[in-house]
Amino acid sequence: MARRRQSEVDGGYRCTGTFDYVSGCDTATYLTFGFALDDDLSAGELATDVITLIPFDQVEIIHNWDVLGLRGTGSNRVVVDDVFVPAHMTIHSFFDPFAAPFPGRTVHEAAMYRRGSLAGLVFAETCSVAIGAARGVLDLYEESIRTRKTTVLPLVPMTEHAQYPRFYGEAVQGIEVAEAALLQTNADYMAEARRAEDEDRDFDPDLDRRLQLRMQLCAKMAYDAVLLMMRTNGSAGMRTGAMWQRYLRDMNVLMTHNTVQPELVADFYGRLHFGLMPHGAESLVPQAR
């Protein structure tokens, strides 16, 4: 990814940068990007001082989303080349803890918009897709078990075999627990947003991180269930064009997303809980103004 930079000019900013993985860019009317001011690149490539809103017709889309799965997201590269963005179409970076509250917090009446955490929404989106895909695989797996025989001795219907009903039960177990945990996490998120609104305070940051812990594990549980079903179903579902293939490709790509890395978020939470800075985070903390 090229360095993203902007220069402050009269009435706004001139912005230049290259952004990969911009999901939905082909159908968007406006796109949102973060830029660093020319004199503030201390955090390197990911430095972000200002979030901008840029019309679709002022950017170039490079169709480079040539990946194994999730092709429908259209997560292509977007190039911004010396585009002027007026100041009223920008907000400060949400990475800056010393900045004033976002003006949009006062626009909507719903507590999730007025007090909710952005990370909670993003993590829930990815996790729900993982669980939905796992349920799709579960449907295929049940159909397979009901209609096929085993391929090794004893040659019996899979429903009568000692192991296949158990494999199905284990898959249901993992998916049901993941879904129930996600729904409860979402309920806890909304409850905390309402409490924060009633008490005129920020969303509890420790709870926010714990909710993220839950959601990432939910996605992993769904993925583990999919791998169990894929492995025990045999090669029957691996034919070209089979829905099994599509689900496997999509799940494998989904699990590479940075919002479904449970080990990383567990390390992040644990270090903060014991008063330590997350690894490499020192450069991302701006100095108090």
Placement of each model-derived feature along the sequence:
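Well-ordered mid-protein domain cores that form the structural environment of catalytic cofactors
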Residues: 1-11
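Generic recognition of long tandem-repeat/solenoid scaffolds
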Residues: 12-16, 78-81
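C-terminal helix-coil-helix/basic helical segment that borders enzyme active sites and/or dimer interfaces
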Residues: 179-217, 230-238
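Glycine-rich beta->alpha junctions and the first turn(s) of the following alpha-helix
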Residues: 68, 75-175
